[in-house]
Amino acid sequence: MRDYADNDSILLKHGWCEMLKGGVIMDVKNVEQAKIAEKAGAIGVMILENIPSELRNTDGVARSVDPLKIEEIRKCISINVLAKVRIGHFVEAQILEELKVDMLDESEVLTMADEYNHINKHKFKTPFVCGCTNLGEALRRISEGASMIRTKGEAGTGNIIEAIKHIRTVNNEIKYLCSLDESEVYNFAKKLRAPIDLILLTRKLKRLPVVNFAAGGIATPADAAMCMQLGMDGVFVGSGIFESENPQKMASSIVMAVSNFNNPKILLNVSLGLGKAMHGNTKVSNKWKNKSEEDNS
C-alpha cells in the first residue's frame, strides 16, 4: 500500500499543483493564442495541435502535440506549459517529460492508445492531471499517480452541463462517504473499485486529496464562477475563449471571474460587453464516450 501522506515524490508533485489553485489554464494551439492567455492572467497553457472544438469535428487519430510546437510557444511566454498525451501512451509521456513540460494531461480528448491500461504516473517526475466523471474514477487515477484531477465534461462544446454533472457527482459521493458508519466504508470502497487508503484519506479531508479543476464546456465568466462556487480549485478553458467574438476580453474576464467567483458585482462587470460567446453545441453526444469510465477503467 502506498502512503499518500508521506512520500517525497508524491508530496513534491502535489505541492506544485497546490500552487495552481485559483487559476485558469487555457488550451492553445499557437503563439498568438498563448500570448492572449498570458496577457489575460492565465497560470498556464495547454498546448495542442487543435483545440477541442476542432478535434470534435475530425475523424482522424488525435495524438500528442509536435514537441517543436511546444518549444516555439514556450520561448514566447513565461507561464506554465502543459501538454496532453493519449491514455496509456507512456512513450508520449516520456518524450514530453524529456522536453521538461510543467505538467502532462493523460487525456480522453486524444485518441486512446491503450484500451485497458492508464499510464503508471508514479514512474514520472512530471505531475499528471487526469479526467474523471465520478469519485471512484478520480481515486483510481490518483492511485496511478495523478497529482491533479479535472472533470471530463464535454470539451469543445461550450456546453457546461456534463462538467456540472461530474462536479456534483463527485461532491455528492464524497458527502455520502463522509456520512457512512466506519463499518460501511470498506464495502463502499469495493463498490467504487477504489483503494481503501485513498477512500479513508478522502473521508478525513472531506474532499479529493489532490487539486481538482473543472473542465469541459466552460465558455463564459459565469460558467467559470459557477464551477468555482461548486467547490472547484480552478478551471481549464480553451474553445470557449478562442471561438468567441473577442478572445482577449473573454480570456481576461474568465480569469477575473475565477478570482472573484463569490462577488456578483465583479462578475457582472466582467460579463459586460464581451460580444458573442462561442456558438456551442447543445447535442451532447460525447464523441469520446468510448473512453469513458464506464467502458474502460
From Swiss-Prot:
Alphabetically sorted, this entry's keywords are: Lyase, Pyridoxal phosphate, Schiff base
Q: Which reaction does it catalyse?
A: aldehydo-D-ribose 5-phosphate + D-glyceraldehyde 3-phosphate + L-glutamine = pyridoxal 5'-phosphate + L-glutamate + phosphate + 3 H2O + H(+)
Q: Does the keyword Lyase apply?
A: yes
Q: Which residues form the active site?
A: K84
Q: In the Enzyme Commission scheme, what number(s) does this protein have?
A: 4.3.3.6
Residue positions annotated to bind D-glyceraldehyde 3-phosphate are R168
Disulfide bond annotation, renumbered to this chain: none
Q: Which Pfam families match?
A: SOR_SNZ
Q: Mutating L82A leads to what result?
A: No effect on glutaminase activity. 4-fold reduction in overall pyridoxal 5'-phosphate synthase activity
Q: Which Gene3D superfamilies match?
A: Aldolase class I
Q: So where does this one cross the membrane?
A: none
Q: Please provide, alphabetically and separated by semicolons, the GO molecular function terms listed in this UniProt record.
A: pyridoxal 5'-phosphate synthase (glutamine hydrolysing) activity
Pathway terms, separated by semicolons? Cofactor biosynthesis; pyridoxal 5'-phosphate biosynthesis
Example of a GO biological process term: pyridoxine biosynthetic process
> Is Lyase there in the keyword field?
yes
Indicate which residues the UniProt annotation says bind D-ribose 5-phosphate: D27, G156, G217, G238, S239
Q: What does this protein do?
A: Catalyzes the formation of pyridoxal 5'-phosphate from ribose 5-phosphate (RBP), glyceraldehyde 3-phosphate (G3P) and ammonia. The ammonia is provided by Pdx2. Can also use ribulose 5-phosphate and dihydroxyacetone phosphate as substrates, resulting from enzyme-catalyzed isomerization of RBP and G3P, respectively.
**Subunit:** Homohexamer and homododecamer. In the presence of Pdx2, forms a dodecamer of heterodimers.
**Which family does the similarity line name?**
Belongs to the PdxS/SNZ family.
**What is the protein name stated in its UniProt record?**
Pyridoxal 5'-phosphate synthase subunit Pdx1
Whichever gene encodes this chain, its name is: pdx1
